[in-house]
Regions:
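Short amphipathic alpha-helix segments
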Residues: 319-339
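Oxidoreductase and adenylate-handling cofactor-binding alpha/beta cores
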Residues: 87-106, 152-157, 278-291, 327-331
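Rossmann-like dinucleotide-binding domain for NAD(H)/NADP(H)
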Residues: 158, 213-311, 315-317, 328-329, ...
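Phosphate-binding beta-alpha-beta segment of Rossmann-like dinucleotide-binding domains, i.e.
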Residues: 79-135, 294-295
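N-terminal Rossmann-fold NAD(P) dinucleotide-binding loop
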Residues: 145-146
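An N-terminal-biased, well-structured beta-alpha scaffold segment characteristic
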Residues: 1-78, 184, 204-209, 340, ...
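Rossmann-like adenosine-cofactor binding region
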Residues: 39-44, 160, 164-252, 267
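Glycine-rich Rossmann-fold phosphate-binding loop(s) that bind the pyrophosphate
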Residues: 141-142
C-alpha cells in the first residue's frame, strides 16, 4: 500500500486513477509520493519514506530537484498536458494586445452620459492592428510553442521560431539559429521557455533592442525570463507597444501598455484534469513497474509493464558503469537477470538502475563491500 500526499488541490478526475493500492494521507512524513501543483517545496523536510514527487504541470521551479536526486526521490512533471490551455490564452493575449482591448475596456467602464456619441468620438484612439499577415516569433518550440505555431498559422500569420534544441515536427515554420537574426522580423514575440540559468533574464536591453520597433511581447512562460527594468524602458520609449504577461509583480502593476493576467495559463478544468491524470499515471508506472518517464531529475528508464517476473530498482552513486557493476553484484548473489537498464545523471553521476530478475526472493542480495556502499536506496517490485 502506497500513501500519497497532495500539497495543492488536485483534480478528482486524476485522483480517480489511483487504485486500491494507494491511499491519500494528510501526513507528509508518511507519504511515499507527493502530488503538487504550485506549492513551494524548497524549504520542506523530506522523510526517508518519500520516493517520488509528481508535479501536475510543466514547471518545476518550486521543487528542489538536485536535493531530491541525491535522496533517490524521482521528480516527475506533465509536459504537454496543459499545452492547449496555454496556447488558447496566448492567442487571447495576442488578440487583446493587437486590438488595444484592455485599454478600451478600461475606458468604456468610465462612460456615463451620452454614451453613443462619446463612443463614436473616442473609439479611434484604440484602433489596433489585425494579426492576419503579421509575423509571430516563437522563442521556445516545445509542446506549447508548437501548438501556438500551428494555431497562429491557421489564423494567417507568418511563423518564425528560435529553439537551439528544435527537431522538426512538420510545423512548417522557419527556425533561426540566432535570436538577433529573428527578432527584427517579428511584429509579435511570444516566450515559451523554462526558467533556468541559461534563460533567466534573457529578455534584457539587448534582446529588446533587437526587436522590431512597435512590437508586442507576450510572456506566458516564466516571470524570471524578463528583466523588468529593461522592459519598462522599452515600453516608455515606444520600442514595445504592448506587454502581456501571466505573471504580475510589484514592478508591473498599474503601468500603461501592460496587460497582467493572474497566472491563468493552465487554469482550465480540462488542463487540471489532464495534468492530474498524467501525474498519477506517472507515479503508478514508477511504483508498479519501476519505470521513470517524464522525470526532470533522472533520465528515462522504461521497461514497459511488469510481467510475471520481479524487478529490482536501485539508486546508486559513483559508478562509472552502473549496469556492469550492478550486474556483477546481482550475479554474486546468484540472481539471474533477464534485462537491465540504467539512467545516469551527468551533473553528479547519480544513477537509477532497473533490473528484471528471474527470482521470487532477493533476500540473499547483500549490500556490503565497495559496491554496496554506493547504493543510496533500493526496492523490490512485484505483483
Amino acid at each position: 500500500m502506497y500513501q500519497v500526499k497532495t500539497l495543492n488541490k488536485i483534480s478528482p478526475v486524476g485522483l480517480a486513477h489511483l487504485t486500491e493500492s494507494y491511499i491519500l494521507t494528510d501526513k507528509t512524513e508518511d507519504a511515499d509520493a507527493i502530488l503538487v501543483r504550485s506549492q513551494d517545496m524548497h524549504e520542506m523536510e523530506f522523510s526517508e519514506k518519500l520516493e517520488a514527487i509528481a508535479r501536475a504541470g510543466a514547471g518545476v521551479n518550486n521543487i528542489p530537484l538536485d536535493r531530491c536526486a541525491k535522496a533517490g526521490i524521482v521528480v516527475f512533471n506533465t509536459p504537454g498536458a496543459n499545452a492547449n490551455a496555454v496556447k488558447e490564452l496566448v492567442l487571447c493575449g495576442m488578440l487583446l494586445a493587437s486590438r488595444n482591448v484592455p485599454a478600451a475596456l478600461t475606458w468604456a467602464k468610465g462612460l456615463s452620459e451620452d454614451v453613443s456619441k462619446t463612443v463614436e468620438k473616442g473609439k479611434s484612439q484604440f484602433a489596433g492592428h489585425e494579426i492576419l499577415g503579421k509575423t509571430l516569433g516563437i522563442v521556445g518550440l516545445g509542446a506549447i510553442g508548437r501548438k501556438v505555431a500551428e494555431a497562429a498559422k491557421a489564423l494567417g500569420m507568418n511563423i518564425v521560431g528560435y529553439d537551439p534544441y528544435y527537431v522538426s515536427g512538420g510545423e512548417g515554420l522557419t527556425v533561426y539559429p540566432d535570436l538577433a537574426e529573428m527578432l527584427p522580423l517579428c511584429d509579435i514575440v511570444t516566450l515559451h521557455l523554462p526558467a533556468n540559468d541559461a534563460t533567466r533574464g534573457m529578455v534584457n536591453k539587448e534582446f529588446l533592442a533587437s526587436m522590431k520597433d512597435g512590437a508586442i511581447l507576450l510572456n506566458f512562460s516564466r516571470d524570471k525570463l524578463v528583466n523588468d527594468v529593461d522592459l519598462l524602458v522599452a515600453l516608455e520609449s515606444g520600442k514595445l507597444t504592448q506587454y502581456v504577461t501571466d505573471f504580475p509583480n510589484d514592478n508591473l502593476i498599474g503601468r500603461e501598455h501592460i496587460t497582467l493576467l493572474p497566472h491563468l495559463g493552465a487554469s482550465t478544468a480540462e488542463a487540471e484534469d489532464n495534468c492530474a491524470t498524467m501525474a498519477v499515471m506517472e507515479l503508478r508506472d514508477y511504483f508498479e513497474n519501476g519505470n521513470i518517464i517524464n522525470s526532470v531529475n533522472f533520465p528515462k528508464v522504461d521497461m514497459g509493464p511488469l510481467g510475471d517476473l520481479r524487478r529490482l530498482a536501485f539508486f546508486v552513486r559513483d559508478m562509472e558503469n552502473p549496469v556492469e557493476e550492478m550486474m556483477n553484484m546481482l550475479s554474486a548473489a546468484e540472481i539471474k537477470v533477464s534485462k537491465i537498464q540504467a539512467g545516469r545523471r551527468a551533473a553528479d553521476g547519480i544513477a537509477y538502475v532497473l533490473a528484471e530478475v528471474e527470482t521470487t526472493d532477493a533476500s540473499n542480495l547483500l549490500f556490503g563491500g565497495e559496491t554496496g556502499a554506493k547504493i543510496l536506496r533500493h526496492r523490490e517490485i512485484g505483483k
